[in-house]
Amino acid sequence: MLRTALRGAPRLLSRVQPRAPCLRRLWGRGARPEVAGRRRAWAWGWRRSSSEQGPGPAAALGRVEAAHYQLVYTCKVCGTRSSKRISKLAYHQGVVIVTCPGCQNHHIIADNLGWFSDLNGKRNIEEILTARGEQVHRVAGEGALELVLEAAGAPTSTAAPEAGEDEGPPSPGKTEPS
C-alpha cells in the first residue's frame, strides 16, 4: 500500500512549486527525487543533488555576497552619530538619501541618476567629501575598529616646559628614525 502511494509522488512533486524564490531555484534544477531504477530513497535524491560539486545552485549556496553597506556618519547639523544599512545597488547605480534621527534632516549619500543639480556631477558621498577636502573612512569587516585623530597638532600646555621636558616618550602612532 505504501508503494502504491509513493508511486504517484514524483508526479505530484513535479507540479508543486515552493513559495520562497531561493527554494524555487533549487527545486527547478534537479533537486527532485530521482525515480530512475525505482530507487527507494526519496531523501537520498535530495542529498545527492544538493552535495554535488560544480556549477549550479548547489555550488553557489556557499558563496555569500553582502548586498548592503553599513553607513556610519555624524550629522554636521546636530552632531548626532547614527548608523544606516544601505543597498549596494542603490549606492552605485541609484539614489541614497538618509534621514538624521536627531534633527530629521535629509542627507544625500549617493546620486547616480542626476536628481540633484547642486552636486556638480559628483555621484556619491566619497566624491562630495573629497571635493571639500574631507576624508571618508572605509572599514572592512564586522569586528573592525576605527580610530581617527580629529585634532592633529602638538598639545598646548599652560605651564612653560622645563629643560628636557619637551622631549617625552614617542606617540604610539609615530615612528622615530633610529
Curated annotation (Swiss-Prot):
GO biological process, one term: protein stabilization
The gene coding this protein: DNLZ
GO molecular function: protein folding chaperone; protein-folding chaperone binding; zinc ion binding
Subunit and interaction comment: Oligomerizes in a concentration-dependent fashion. Interacts with HSPA9.
Keywords for the protein's UniProt record, in alphabetical order: Chaperone, Metal-binding, Mitochondrion, Transit peptide, Zinc, Zinc-finger
PANTHER family, per the entry: DNL-TYPE ZINC FINGER PROTEIN
Function: May function as a co-chaperone towards HSPA9/mortalin which, by itself, is prone to self-aggregation.
Protein name: DNL-type zinc finger protein
Pfam families: zf-DNL
Source species: Homo sapiens
Zinc finger (DNL-type) stretch: 64-161
Region of interest: Disordered: 151-178
Upper lineage: Eukaryota, Metazoa, Chordata, Craniata, Vertebrata
Record's GO cellular component terms: cytosol; mitochondrion; nucleoplasm; nucleus
